[in-house]
Amino acid sequence: MNNKFPEKLYHYCSISTFMSIIKNKCFWLSDTRYTNDKEELAAFRASVDEVILELLTDNVIDKKMADELWWTYIYNTLPGYISCFSEKGDLLSQWRSYGDDGKGIAISVDFNKLNIEKGGPFRFAGNVKKYYGNKVIYADSNLKNQIKEILKKIIEGKNSMAEIRPDDLCGIFNLSYYSKNEGFREEAEWRIVYLPLLLFNSTTKEAISGENTDLENTKFRTNGEKIISYFEFSFLPDSINEIVVGPKNNSDRDTLSMFLVANGFRNVNIQKSQIPYS
């Protein structure tokens, strides 16, 4: 079988979140503005801004193309929604940061059985809803140079944005939503990304509803301090092939098996973390 994705990618979470995911058969895709990576997304946008300005200053592009390039980038990198996974199913740093300090669960997912496409991500109007999956790119201090090289290749021989296909910009979008600082390489992270179409009145700033927007599909939760929007990403039970019980989680194996089967999940391998952590 020539799979596009790994068959085992792990989502670390608390035991209560694990129960919610299994019961509802969906992951939550969180607003990137409220994730741990929001600073990196802001830094990436600033780098793109600097690169476009440099290309304009160096007469590689003119003002019109600079504006078109910038707004095309902004449109496709408005707040996105992501869910994070790791190639590693028993990693101490992941247990500490995302698995309730070792008291949680790591859910193994076969990405090939999910309704996702590789590449992108792209934002679509109307009823087109596409979810994308890709491996995180761990960028070093030369990220700005990487962005510049990608943009130069995209615009080479082009006189306007009309000559540039959306797929040509895939490299920039990938870097934006799938890039992370080199210091996090140990996480071996993958992401599911969804770019909804959410519109706001330019004068009143009020959200616009309608059949061509995703407002009606937006869900909301609270973190105790603010209201946060998210989207649900549904999956079928056969997408889950294994769970790893955290090093500080004392759940009974038989009870976990009963819970999984009662919710339609069969043939799920149940493993216990091998990390000595208490």
Where does each model-flagged region fall?
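Partner-binding and oligomerization surfaces adjacent to conserved cores of proteins
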Residues: 1-278
